[in-house]
């Protein structure tokens, strides 16, 4: 049987690190097994779903290289959901309810005050036909799925054996009074129709899974296998949900995080395997195993992405960055030497721009007060550009002879005057790249 997985984001916002884990795991399972990966946009929320978010989701996945085999939109399948709803009505598994949100809230509070679980009391099932007709005229009705009150069990790919008593769960609302088909229902119909065989999603969906198993069975479908991964927390264990707006993929991308650095962290975070940098998707897939992930909340710190990014970019061959370097305006004959000098001194590729500005426009000199006279004298001994591989040795030898300085007292002030930095690349490699020197004699 072909493995079919899906990633089903709602286009009500951009992808963040939390749902990236879901996307990556489902993609990896499909790719590793030679199966099919579906991108399904769960866009039935007409008010909140935006085309810009749909486009953004696809752009982010393409940036990461998480390509899909099929694209589906729930908004194209509304007629199918209506058919499935009729099927459930005929089977006696779909019933209309009329309570207002306020009335439901009062019921919940009453049950909680009595020390009972806030499970819907199925009062709507006791209404007569006349009462239903009267209520329909007063307010719109919404629809619930009638759960069989038995234990719902499955073996989870991460959590292990799961058993949930359906009597402890409210009959789920599947269609709102305004006609909007809700996630629990549309997703169940889609997963059956699209032949989905394996679903990985967050641990906050476990109860949803229990109800969806019954919905799928009521529609004559075979539920897929499920695995529920842990939820992410902040670095100190705090809830991450309020911070997800600052952890969208496009925000991390804007900060210079590389796709493979992000995927490498997410492919191992929360698993029994150590995080390591993968340079290709093939390397990542070779070491991926959903069974190595645990149930405990997983700490995520965005700062962990930057050592991985630095390691990744510093290992790139020149050909991989040739276009970016050319776009900076680096002359062709200096492009490869520039990369060789700059690569070990950058954290993200965007740092290259700062290095080329330094080389092409000159650095603001950093001169300690006690070195001012020394630098003025030294600069009189430095000829104008261009410089060659021997220029640094020749310059420092001349300054040493003229001033008597040597060692750190000679080299450090000169480096700071020419580059504005106390540390950096070997000056013998820097000099041939310097187009301008701003320190004056």
Swiss-Prot record:
- Bilayer-crossing regions: none
Show the GO MF annotations: ATP binding; glutamate-tRNA ligase activity; tRNA binding
Is Ion transport one of the keywords?
no
Location of the protein in the cell: Cytoplasm
Which is a Gene Ontology cellular component entry for this protein? Answer: cytoplasm
Assembly and partners are described as: Monomer.
Question: What is the role of the protein in this entry?
Answer: Catalyzes the attachment of glutamate to tRNA(Glu) in a two-step reaction: glutamate is first activated by ATP to form Glu-AMP and then transferred to the acceptor end of tRNA(Glu).
What is the gene called?
gltX2
Q: Where is this motif: 'HIGH' region?
A: 9-19
List keywords of the entry alphabetically: Aminoacyl-tRNA synthetase, ATP-binding, Cytoplasm, Ligase, Nucleotide-binding, Protein biosynthesis
Known EC number(s)? Answer: 6.1.1.17
Motif mapping: 'KMSKS' region: 239-243
Q: Does the keyword Lyase apply?
A: no
Instruction: Determine the domain of life of the protein's source.
Output: Bacteria
Per UniProt, where does ATP bind?
A: 242
Q: Which InterPro entries match?
A: aa-tRNA-synth_I_cd-bd, aa-tRNA-synth_I_codon-bd_sub2, aa-tRNA-synth_I_CS, aa_tRNA-synth_I_cd-bd_sf, Glu-tRNA-ligase_bac/mito, Glu/Gln-tRNA-synth, Glu/Gln-tRNA-synth_Ib_cat-dom, GluQ/Sye
Record PROSITE patterns: AA_TRNA_LIGASE_I
Protein family according to the UniProt entry: Belongs to the class-I aminoacyl-tRNA synthetase family. Glutamate--tRNA ligase type 1 subfamily.
Enumerate the Gene Ontology biological process terms: glutamyl-tRNA aminoacylation
- List the catalysed reactions: tRNA(Glu) + L-glutamate + ATP = L-glutamyl-tRNA(Glu) + AMP + diphosphate
Q: Which organism is it from?
A: Cereibacter sphaeroides (strain ATCC 17023 / DSM 158 / JCM 6121 / CCUG 31486 / LMG 2827 / NBRC 12203 / NCIMB 8253 / ATH 2.4.1.) (Rhodobacter sphaeroides)
Name of this protein? Glutamate--tRNA ligase 2
């Amino acid at each position: 049987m072909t493995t079919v997985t899906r990633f089903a984001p709602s286009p009500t916002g951009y992808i963040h690190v939390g749902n990236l884990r879901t996307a990556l795991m489902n993609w990896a399972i499909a790719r590793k097994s030679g199966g099919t990966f579906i991108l399904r946009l769960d866009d039935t929320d007409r008010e909140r779903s935006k085309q810009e978010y749909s486009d953004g989701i696809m752009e982010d996945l393409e940036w990461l290289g998480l390509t899909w085999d099929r694209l589906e939109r729930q908004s194209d399948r509304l007629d199918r959901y209506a058919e499935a709803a009729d099927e459930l009505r005929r089977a006696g598994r779909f019933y209309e309810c009329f309570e207002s949100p306020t009335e439901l809230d009062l019921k919940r509070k009453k049950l909680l005050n009595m020390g009972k679980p806030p499970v819907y009391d199925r009062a709507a099932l006791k209404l007569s036909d006349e009462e239903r007709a009267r209520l329909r005229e007063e307010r719109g009705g919404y629809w619930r799925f009638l759960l069989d009150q038995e234990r719902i069990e499955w073996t989870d790919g991460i959590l292990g054996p799961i058993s949930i008593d359906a009597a402890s769960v409210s009959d789920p609302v599947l269609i709102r009074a305004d006609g909007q088909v809700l996630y629990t229902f549309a997703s169940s119909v889609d997963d059956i129709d699209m032949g989905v065989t394996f679903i990985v999603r967050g641990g906050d969906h476990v109860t949803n899974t229990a109800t969806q198993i019954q919905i799928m069975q009521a529609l004559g479908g075979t539920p897929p296998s499920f695995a529920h991964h842990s939820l992410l927390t902040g670095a100190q264990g705090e809830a991450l949900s309020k911070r997800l707006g600052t952890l969208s993929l496009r925000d991390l991308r804007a900060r210079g995080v590389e796709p493979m650095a992000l995927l490498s962290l997410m492919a191992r975070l929360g698993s029994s395997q150590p995080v390591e940098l993968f340079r290709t998707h093939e390397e990542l897939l070779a070491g991926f195993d959903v069974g190595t992930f645990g149930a405990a909340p997983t700490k995520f710190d965005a700062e962990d992405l930057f050592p991985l990014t630095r390691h990744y970019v510093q290992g790139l061959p020149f050909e991989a960055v040739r276009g970016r370097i050319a776009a900076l305006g680096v002359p062709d004959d200096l492009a490869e030497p520039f990369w060789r000098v700059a690569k070990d001194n950058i954290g993200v590729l965007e740092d290259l721009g700062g290095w080329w500005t330094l080389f092409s426009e000159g650095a603001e000199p950093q001169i300690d007060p006690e070195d001012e006279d020394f630098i003025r004298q030294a600069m009189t001994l430095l000829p104008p550009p261009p410089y060659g591989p021997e220029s640094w040795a020749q310059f420092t030898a001349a300054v040493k002879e003229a001033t008597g300085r040597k060692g750190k007292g000679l080299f450090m002030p000169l480096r700071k005057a020419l580059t504005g930095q106390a540390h950096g690349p070997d000056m013998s490699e820097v000099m041939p790249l310097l187009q301008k020197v701003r320190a004056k004699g």
